[in-house]
């Protein structure tokens, strides 16, 4: 019989020291009274890996692989025909409304996203994907595609780019066509596209070797930003946008792992607060209550809500088993006969062995006893995971299914949540810690692997991430105590710490600008926020000279950028309120150089190395952003068949009119960074008269396909590559003009927004 949910005032609540009902593992009949770490997040892996086993038995699987780690379990890809159909496809244009932070924020016209049949015959050619979608959707060759279907395909193409398989091979997501009907129905109603991700159960219990504690940290923060960015990227091609729903499986597994329900609650509530505080409006959450069709009742206080949750947690687990248990399912038989289940089981054994190591070391003296206990837990998790997957399928069938585990992509898309090597799922936030390196790299690692090379950083008294040990982060020797806050997807904010009513913020005169400059090479943009005297011109120029050699403008050292009010063709778009194209500073700055061998004199482009800003006044909230696109991240997410090596050979030209009237040719698309040697983008976005009253810019790819221009434009605005930076009055900002491209969004006429800028080398 299904337990009836109780009113919180009448609920009998079980606490961590009291006996609990457990159907599977007698060894966890009583919860430890002082559990300080939450148990492993196998949960989210477990929730999905064994799903739909009954439907999967008919598939031909590849031979079993070696045991895999918790982050590297593969579903074997089903055989598929990757050859291209010979179907001729007419051009299809998808209307693309502008998002609030798109440079065309004030434009009234939609920008077309066009799929064209260029006869490339490759999986990377979008027209091939459209062919497959047309055939699946309409069932006949040459049948027309509706505007709603075209929009749905554009949405799914955005989701596809987050897939690990797509990153590895550049091939189409197998499940794309199967989700077209689902997305089309939402597009017809002009609803946000809905995605669901079973994940975020609770932290691994192994705080000795893997994680930093039981609460969300920088790993979860990055993951939520990443998921919200996926939705924002969808909003660039479909105005209603998208939402991703996190369905936590914490309550599905925590009892068999000995994790208190209270630990699951605290972790989940902290995630929700994080999403609200960071204004990640597209990240939403589904409780197990709702998945089992019990409404989550709004309660007057946090304590009342917690009591209600704890009172019904065990009831929900029983109901999940009662409604979705497959009585015919034999976990042992499935492990022996089904490849997916076997791989999942091996993965569980792998990470359970490490996650439970501190407990096993004290509870079991023999390796054999430890192995038997872990195997029992793994089998139980497979059973629970199958139930949870069935509940999701039954109650959220109209959601696009995301996964944190590798799969062939037929029914879900495998994505990574935190920065990883290209094409690798890597560790989840609840199985790892984040390491921030001095070169700007963010890595998901096990804590034991970086404790010697990195220092532990706290936020609000909580261990939050590891930061590489470097003099660049030691400002105490300069007489300052500061906090370093990594931004997503790039950038760093530095704030003074130890400030109160009796200790005012330090002046910028004390800032170690040589360290700021070095940090900006890998961590641009570097923002100095909360310091005094940022708007004193003489002091501002002095700090610029400490950064490097100042490169004056023709009119002086400082360019003060604000809306000049001009609207004629010869006005400078920089001193307007218009959005601007993505670019680097110094496009039109040339110097004559003499070849030491031939004596030939050439005009050579000499852009400044760095920019130094301060902000006297801001635009209204939600406008006037400065966007910074990272070359490092651009090449990380560059989709196949495009490669760094291919782009390094590309040259391009531009034809400008108006204020910037000039024709430039033979410009390299990629240049090496003068310090790191890493490839960096040199680009100016095409900008026609529909986007501006001022100078237009036509761009030509000189020695490769013109399609590359659209690829570059799209990726430089991708939320995985581009930081949308919102200014605060008094901010100082240093950006590496080689490593970063930048632009701004539009803002209201007569707005007081003003930035000062100095170039230096």
UniProtKB/Swiss-Prot annotation:
Induction remarks: Expressed during copper starvation via the regulation of both aceA and macA transcription factors.
Phenotype of gene-disrupted mutants: Abolishes the production of xanthocillin derivatives including a dimethoxyl formyl xanthocillin derivative, the sulfated formyl xanthocillin derivative fumiformamide, a 1,2-diformylamido derivative named melanocin E, and the imidazole-containing melanocin F.
E.C. number: 1.-.-.-
Alphabetically ordered keywords of this record: Oxidoreductase
Comp. bias (Basic and acidic residues): 115-126
Segments passing through the bilayer: none
One Pfam family here: TauD
Name of the protein described by the UniProt record: Isocyanide synthase xanB
Gene giving rise to this polypeptide: xanB
């Amino acid at each position: 019989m299904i337990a009836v949910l109780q009113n919180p005032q009448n609920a009998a609540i079980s606490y961590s020291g009291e006996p609990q009902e457990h159907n599977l593992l007698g060894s966890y009949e009583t919860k430890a009274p002082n559990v300080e770490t939450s148990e492993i997040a196998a949960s989210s892996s477990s929730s999905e890996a064994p799903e739909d086993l009954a439907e999967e038995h008919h598939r031909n699987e590849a031979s079993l692989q070696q045991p895999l780690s918790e982050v590297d379990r593969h579903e074997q890809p089903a055989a598929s025909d990757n050859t291209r159909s010979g179907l001729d496809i007419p051009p299809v244009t998808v209307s693309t409304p502008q998002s609030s932070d798109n440079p065309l924020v004030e434009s009234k016209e939609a920008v077309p996203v066009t799929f064209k049949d260029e006869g490339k015959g490759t999986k990377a050619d979008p027209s091939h994907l459209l062919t497959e979608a047309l055939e699946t959707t309409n069932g006949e060759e040459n049948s027309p595609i509706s505007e709603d279907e075209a929009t749905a395909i554009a949405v799914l193409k955005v989701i596809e780019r987050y897939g690990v398989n797509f990153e590895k091979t550049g091939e189409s997501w197998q499940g794309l066509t199967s989700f077209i009907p689902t997305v089309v129905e939402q597009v017809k109603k002009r609803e946000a596209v809905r995605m669901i991700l079973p994940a975020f159960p609770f932290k691994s219990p192994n705080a000795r070797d893997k994680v930093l504690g039981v609460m969300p940290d920088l790993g979860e923060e990055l993951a939520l930003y990443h998921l919200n960015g996926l939705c924002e990227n969808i909003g660039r091609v479909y105005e209603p946008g998208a939402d991703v729903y996190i369905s936590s499986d914490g309550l599905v597994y925590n009892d068999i792992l000995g994790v208190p329900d209270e630990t699951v609650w605290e972790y989940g509530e902290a995630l929700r607060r994080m999403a609200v505080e960071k204004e990640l409006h597209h990240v939403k959450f589904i409780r197990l209550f709702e998945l089992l069709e019990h409404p989550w009742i709004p309660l007057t206080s946090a304590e009342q809500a917690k009591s209600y949750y704890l009172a019904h947690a065990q009831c929900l687990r029983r109901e999940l088993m009662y409604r979705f248990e497959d009585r015919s399912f034999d976990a042992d038989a499935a492990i022996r006969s089904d490849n997916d289940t076997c791989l999942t089981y091996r993965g569980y054994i792998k990470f359970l062995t490490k996650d439970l190591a501190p407990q096993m070391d004290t509870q079991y003296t023999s390796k054999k006893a430890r192995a038997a206990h872990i195997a029992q837990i793994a089998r139980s998790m497979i059973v629970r995971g199958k139930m949870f997957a069935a509940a999701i399928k039954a109650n959220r069938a109209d959601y696009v299914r995301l996964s944190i585990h590798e799969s062939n992509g037929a029914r879900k898309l495998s994505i990574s949540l935190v920065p990883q090597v290209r094409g690798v799922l890597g560790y989840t936030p609840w199985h790892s810690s984040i390491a921030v390196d001095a070169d700007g790299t963010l890595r998901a690692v096990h804590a034991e692997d970086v404790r010697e090379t990195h220092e532990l950083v706290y936020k609000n008294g909580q261990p939050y991430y590891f930061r590489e040990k470097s003099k660049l982060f030691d400002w105490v020797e300069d007489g300052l105590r500061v906090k370093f806050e990594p931004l997503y997807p790039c950038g760093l904010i530095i704030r003074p710490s130890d400030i109160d009513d009796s200790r005012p913020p330090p002046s910028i005169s004390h800032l170690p600008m040589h360290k700021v400059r070095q940090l900006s090479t890998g961590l641009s943009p570097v923002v100095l926020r909360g310091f005094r005297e940022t708007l004193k011109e003489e002091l501002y120029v002095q700090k610029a000279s400490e950064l490097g050699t100042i490169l004056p403008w023709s009119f002086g050292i400082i360019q003060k950028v604000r809306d000049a009010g001009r609207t004629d063709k010869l006005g400078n778009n920089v001193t307007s309120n218009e959005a601007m194209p993505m670019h680097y500073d110094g496009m039109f700055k040339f110097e004559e150089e003499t070849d030491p061998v031939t004596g030939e004199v050439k005009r050579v482009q000499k852009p400044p190395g760095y920019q130094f800003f301060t902000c006297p006044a801001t635009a209204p909230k939600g406008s006037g952003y400065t966007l910074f696109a990272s070359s490092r991240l651009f090449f990380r997410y560059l989709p196949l068949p495009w490669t760094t090596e291919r782009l390094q050979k590309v040259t391009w030209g531009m034809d400008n009119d108006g204020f910037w009237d000039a024709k430039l040719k033979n410009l390299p698309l990629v240049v090496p960074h003068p310090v790191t040697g890493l490839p960096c983008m040199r680009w100016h976005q095409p900008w026609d008269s529909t986007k501006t009253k001022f100078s237009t810019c036509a761009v030509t790819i000189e020695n490769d396909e013109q399609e590359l221009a659209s690829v570059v434009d799209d990726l430089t605005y991708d939320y995985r590559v581009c930081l949308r930076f919102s200014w605060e009055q008094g901010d100082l900002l240093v950006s590496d003009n080689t490593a970063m491209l930048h632009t701004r969004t539009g803002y209201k006429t007569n707005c007081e927004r003003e930035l000062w800028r100095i170039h230096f080398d």
